[in-house]
Design a protein with these regions (language model features):
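Bacterial signal peptide processing site
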Residues: 14-19
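Alpha-helical segment of the N-proximal tetratricopeptide repeat
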Residues: 43-79
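Flexible helix-coil transition and linker loops at the boundaries of alpha-helical arrays
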Residues: 38-44, 78-91, 119-129, 175-184
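"A position-specific structural signal for the A-helix of alpha-solenoid helical repeats
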Residues: 48-51, 55, 90, 97, ...
Length: 186
């Protein structure tokens, strides 16, 4: 019994001991949030609403009800967010999903307009990079649509393919830049 208690004590101590450099973030599990990093209640409420609309959209998508899914995603874009980077990220994530849903419905021009709204964002992020990926997918869909409707329109087909490649490359450039920044800050 004495050995079991001793073993439990050693295990508990080893789990709570600090390992590595103190700068590696391996300190206490519980840390007080810096007030500058805290998210205010208005933003939390808006993020909660967005999460719920996103879940509704996923349920509608699983039921095959694309129109209702599109409506739910549009609700995310209608939420009044306080100014914050998280708000931009949520909107851009919703724009990417909305654009993909619209592509699935053959509404390519509307999908491109939704993507362009998000690409006007001055802050580069994963979500902006994802919008460039979706932009490339829209160009691919346009090329497929064009090929089905007018196989003789080779110049326009090549133009759409190149636009898709440019969009994918821009997405990769943003992701690489963000990744390099993260590696520098390690």
């Amino acid at each position: 019994m004495k050995y079991i208690v001793l073993l439990a004590f050693v295990a508990a101590c080893s789990c709570s001991a600090k390992h590595g450099d103190p700068g590696e973030g391996s300190g206490s599990v519980t840390q007080v949030t810096d007030p500058a990093d805290a998210i205010d209640q208005k933003l939390m409420i808006a993020l909660s609403q967005a999460k719920n609309f996103h879940h509704k959209a996923k349920v509608y998508m699983s039921d095959g009800n694309t129109a209702a899914a599109i409506a739910s995603v549009r609700e995310i874009l209608a939420i009044r967010f306080p100014p914050a980077p998280e708000a931009d990220d949520v909107r851009n994530d919703a724009r990417a999903l909305l654009a993909r849903l619209l592509v699935g419905q053959g509404q390519l021009d509307e999908a491109m307009n939704v993507v362009k709204e998000g690409l006007s964002s001055p802050r580069e992020s994963f979500f902006v990079a994802n919008l460039y990926t979706v932009k490339g997918e829209i160009h691919e869909a346009r090329a497929q649509q064009l090929e089905a409707q007018d196989p003789t329109a080779k110049a326009k087909l090549v133009e759409e393919h190149h636009a898709a490649i440019e969009a994918f490359d821009q997405s990769n450039r943003i992701d690489k830049k963000l990744q390099d920044q993260l590696m520098e800050n390690r």
